[in-house]
Amino acid sequence: MHMSFSILNKTKGLSEKLFRLLPYILALLLWAALSIYGQYYLKKVEDLSLFLFDSLYLKEAAQTPGGLLGAMGSFLTQFLYYPWLGALIWTIVLLSVYQLTIKAFDIPKRLMSLAVIPAALLVIANMSLGYGVYIMREPDHFFAPSLGYLAALIPHFTFRHVRSLWGRILFLTIWTAAGYPVLGMFAFLGTVSASLTALTQPGSLRKERFTLFASGIILVLV
């Protein structure tokens, strides 16, 4: 009987380890598939993208909300000229999305698979365009959403160090005002998601949670 329980525990431990490794195995398979079967698509995305090492290009990008994020996405898109390298960079970004989602939202081990959802949606959004890639007006579409999502997690990590209500409201105000010109809608995403998460945080007064949530929504609407 004791031996049976020991075998069951070992099997359970092994399955848990394999489950934790599954996202990394999927990432490796994604990189291999893109490098081998997605070469033409990745090269076409790079061919339709534009990035210039020029101050005028950056100034024009800065005039549009989220333009600098787009410029950063366009910069990384250049690496798709070598499909294996561009796919590797994107895979690393997606793994960062997975890992930081777990940490930002304090996802428990039994629900860690949920952290794959944002990365999976980013993959679907990029790889389901088909011929639509020829009519896309955003040459930065391949990398910019992933980078924007990562940036939108910053308020979550900041809230861990800023505990006071007014300190958090001040941070959200600065974040929204300074982040919107650089990140565009992803600055709003960070504000709203952090405000929503604050509603579920234990150890704080209900009035404070709703005040913070309302402040975040008002900042986005204003």
Language-model features and meaning:
Residues 1-31:
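Start-transfer (signal-anchor) and selected internal transmembrane alpha helices
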Residues 19-43, 218-221:
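Transmembrane signal-anchor helices characteristic of membrane glycosylation enzymes that use polyprenol
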Residues 31-88, 93:
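Membrane-interface coil-to-helix junctions
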Residues 31-35, 117-128, 173-184, 215-222:
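Aromatic-anchored segments of alpha-helical transmembrane domains
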Residues 44, 62, 66, 110-165, ...:
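Membrane-interface micro-motifs in multi-pass membrane enzymes
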Residues 91-108, 151-158:
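Transmembrane-helix motifs of polytopic, lipid-linked glycan transferases
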Residues 101-112, 161-166, 199-210:
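Membrane-interface helix-boundary motifs at transmembrane edges
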Residues 161-201, 216-221:
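Transmembrane helices and adjacent periplasmic/lumenal helix-loop junctions
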